[in-house]
A protein has these predicted regions:
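Zinc-dependent deaminase
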Residues: 1-3, 78-176
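Short, flexible loop/turn motifs enriched in small residues
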Residues: 6-10
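Short beta-strand scaffold segments in enzyme catalytic cores
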Residues: 11-17
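Glycine-biased flexible loop/turn sites that connect beta-strands or occur in inter-domain linkers
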Residues: 20-21
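Short beta->alpha transition motifs characteristic of CBS
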Residues: 25-31
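A short, polar/charged loop-to-alpha-helix boundary motif
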Residues: 31-45
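Mobile, glycine- and charge-enriched loop segments
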Residues: 41-65, 159-161, 165-176
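Local cysteine-cluster metal-coordination motifs and their immediate loop/turn environment
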Residues: 62-78, 95-100
Length: 176
């Protein structure tokens, strides 16, 4: 809420200990301070600024939304071997009116097959399991086991997104 009230997008992340799922750091987008401080990147920054911290491979990386290309790279370069998210790229675009993740992944990374002008329809935008990390979409399990909680979270993020959308363009954020 504080980040959105400051003019930032609705994304956030937390880094937890794998051993007990306790929170090590949590962060929200802070693009008004620096356009690179996406929730995940800001969490990584805070994690490595700690005087001591567990090895990234001993952590769970939790994202409110599926990471963009910047954050995917940050997670890989930082040594986190996993991340989980609740809202997908499609959710960000369709439910929260923030389409840039899909647009950038398609424009920059989606290399078309030689026999077509664009990438194959429905092709994943990144390798969800690769040499660097494995990603997990939490929504199917959350929706099945905690439908009321998911509905409340979706409503909260829709409200925060509406607040952000009403104010976007008044700050100094690229791709607002």
């Amino acid at each position: 809420r504080t980040g959105v009230a400051s003019g930032n997008k609705i994304f956030g992340a937390a880094i937890l200990r794998k051993s007990d799922l306790s929170v090590i750091v949590a962060a929200a987008n802070d693009e008004t301070a620096n356009p690179l401080w996406h929730g995940e990147i800001h969490a990584i920054k805070k994690f490595f600024e700690l005087p001591s911290h567990p090895a990234p491979a001993d952590c769970v990386f939790l994202c409110t939304h599926e990471p963009c290309s910047l954050c995917l790279s940050g997670i890989a370069w930082s040594g986190f071997d996993n991340f989980s998210y609740l809202f997908s790229h499609a959710d960000s675009a369709m439910s929260f009116a923030i389409p840039y993740d899909i647009a950038i992944l398609n424009a920059v990374y989606a290399v078309p097959d030689p026999d077509r002008s664009g990438p194959a329809p429905g092709r994943d935008l990144y390798n969800r399991s690769n040499d660097y990390f494995t990603s997990t979409n939490l929504m199917p399990v959350a929706r099945a086991q905690l439908p009321d909680t998911v509905d409340r979270l979706h409503a909260l993020y829709a409200e925060l997104s509406a607040q952000y959308q009403a104010r976007k363009g008044t700050g100094n954020i690229a791709m607002a």
